[in-house]
């Protein structure tokens, strides 16, 4: 199945292809014409708590996916990161850092700590 929290904000033209296993968290923001494939997670890294250990509600903790992004099968994007407009996130990528517009992130380059040079447009 597909699990989309009702609080997620989703733009027009959003498309899920082969949606089994897709999870979209409560504070996720998805732009226009975004495509996701099976088993993609747009999740939180953690749920912050207050001084009493109670969960703090209303904090943005899920990814922002800008317009015209494609995220391939099995990718996991965690935390309040931004995936820049026109980027492509490859299959099985685990991502906890923002990427600028036009980025191409593959499993091979996500296995190493991504430097600013590795995240340049068109790489």
What do the predicted segments below correspond to?
Residues 2-113, 117:
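Structural signal for interior beta-strand "rungs" in well-ordered beta-sheet cores
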């Amino acid at each position: 199945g597909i699990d989309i929290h009702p609080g997620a904000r989703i733009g027009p033209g959003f498309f899920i292809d082969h949606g089994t296993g897709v999870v979209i968290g409560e504070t996720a923001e998805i732009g226009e014409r975004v495509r996701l494939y099976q088993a993609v997670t747009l999740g939180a890294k953690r749920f912050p708590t207050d001084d009493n250990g109670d969960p703090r509600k209303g904090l943005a903790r899920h990814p922002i996916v800008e317009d015209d992004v494609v995220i391939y099968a099995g990718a996991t994007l965690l935390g309040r990161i931004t995936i820049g407009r026109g980027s492509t996130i490859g299959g099985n990528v685990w991502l906890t850092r923002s990427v600028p517009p036009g980025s191409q992130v593959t499993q091979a380059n996500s296995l190493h700590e991504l430097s600013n040079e590795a995240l340049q447009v068109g790489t």
